[in-house]
Amino acid sequence: MLPYTPLYYPILPPLTIPYMKTLIQDAVIINEGRSFVGSVLIDGAFVAAVYEEGETPRVDGATVINARGQWLLPGVIDDHVHFREPGMTHKGTIASESRAAVAGGVTTFMDMPNTNPKTVTRREWEWKMARAADTSAANYAFYFGGSDDNAD
């Protein structure tokens, strides 16, 4: 088994996925600057282990996905998104856009402050953090905008 530091942030919030073990077997894994054939064990919402080819143990009760010939990459961090909540939810919300991001392999996003109202006060930033805690399907961060009104 490769040395591996467990993730401290869930791939998805625990409320959105049932607890289960999943073994993705025989994929071409891209990680840490190299590619190799191996397997990944997911325990609940966390990556529990990464195995080189031929080292994969039998995991009782796990759903096994045969990924032979498929590529398996770490989740993408999108550091520049415009989710438009609050104020322009007809264009998108944290809930809708984070789910779309996860469907495309993005596991973390960083949202820009140009919403309505703009995220230029602690109050607006805390509102977005609380909203994401309740609705986001991905890990998140929010930029804080600078303006003439908050230069201090």
Listing of model-derived features with the role each one plays in the protein:
Residues 131-145:
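A glycine-rich helix N-cap at a beta->alpha junction
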Residues 150-152:
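Hydrophobic, small-residue-rich alpha-helical packing segments that form membrane-like cores
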